[in-house]
Amino acid sequence: MLVNSQDLSLSSYDYELDSKLIAQKPLNPRHDARLMVVSKDNGPNLCVSHLKVWNLLDELRAGDLLVINNTRVLKARLRVRLKSGAMAELLLLEPHGDGRWLCLAKPAKKFLPGDYVWMEALEQESLKLQVLTKDLETGGRIVQFPQEFSNRKSIENLLERYGEVPLPPYIRQHDPSDADRYQTRFASTPGSVAAPTAGLHLSDEILNALIQRGIEKASVTLHVGLGTFRPIEEEDLTNLKLHSEWVEVGEEVVSAVQACRSRGGRIFAVGTTTVRSLEASFLLGGGSMKAFQGLVDLVIKPGYQFGVVNGLLTNFHLPKSSLLLLVSALIGRERLLELYQEAIERKYRFFSYGDAMFITPEAVLPGAKSPRVLQ
């Protein structure tokens, strides 16, 4: 699939957005969010419908497969006290073994290697953490927790009790209810520091209705971290690299995809993290899905050919983000930016708590389909 130079320039993925369109809280019920359905007429033109997420029931059919990301967001933000007495914060990103964690520190310049910081939310005496080193790749800090927190489960318990939900910075006011509403209804595997936001739209009611209509469901796990939300800094995207994230695609997912293909069904990903998980499995299998677990740094941008995914439910993403690149790979950058402009004109709500877009198989660029898989 040919791409032009603009497709590989970060500035080509910019757009202007009125801050009033950045959703500050989700709708209730979840499935009441607006849904831009992108299909195609009998010719080359896209056909756009403006519906509600509940209408997803009318876009899917019996035999289709909906794949979700079952990761659960950790309360990964910790308030700590510096040796100066000032308060600061750590955002725990990923474990590095033996009680060591990669963290984003704020303000970073106050966290020097060798320093100690203290958590004071505990009933007992304050918990002392040591800053070991600066991580050159991320600009974060490797922080050592005490011996009693050397395994992941003990840290997860600590965060659940004393941590805070790490909402994106564009959500200005935090609410206690965010602990629930910033989780998908199927979040079951702790490990993310941001939600797979497309899944936030799927209420229990719509999930049950999908099952009743014969639409199959399968789950992957991708723990959302820097690879998803870290801003891209380089203008030339030719050799873009993303920070790796932990993924698990089980045998049951591989079987579900194969069964769906056999019966002539279509495979829809809920969110860009699910897309990356499925496509990583496809690439690792050399053109056939393979069950695996491990770190993935797959970059999907225009020119990529999809081997698994036929369609996508996704949110409206930040300018110049890796998520925008991924969706552009599916339907084309210029077409996507035109759709975003239409969404802005129609006052759609953007980003994590915002509205959604549903890309049907008909809207996918012909060149974006891998010749190795029957689409």
UniProtKB/Swiss-Prot annotation:
Keywords: Cytoplasm, Queuosine biosynthesis, S-adenosyl-L-methionine, Transferase. Its main location: cytoplasm. Pfam families: Queuosine_synth (PF02547). Gene3D superfamilies: QueA-like. It is found in: Cytoplasm. It comes from the Bacteria. Pathway: tRNA modification; tRNA-queuosine biosynthesis. The keyword Transferase applies. GO terms for biological process: queuosine biosynthetic process; tRNA wobble guanine modification. GO terms for molecular function: S-adenosylmethionine:tRNA ribosyltransferase-isomerase activity. The keyword S-adenosyl-L-methionine applies. Its EC number is 2.4.99.17. It catalyses: 7-aminomethyl-7-carbaguanosine(34) in tRNA + S-adenosyl-L-methionine = epoxyqueuosine(34) in tRNA + adenine + L-methionine + 2 H(+). GO terms for cellular component: cytoplasm. Transfers and isomerizes the ribose moiety from AdoMet to the 7-aminomethyl group of 7-deazaguanine (preQ1-tRNA) to give epoxyqueuosine (oQ-tRNA). Monomer. Belongs to the QueA family. This is S-adenosylmethionine:tRNA ribosyltransferase-isomerase. It comes from Prochlorococcus marinus (strain MIT 9211). The gene is queA.
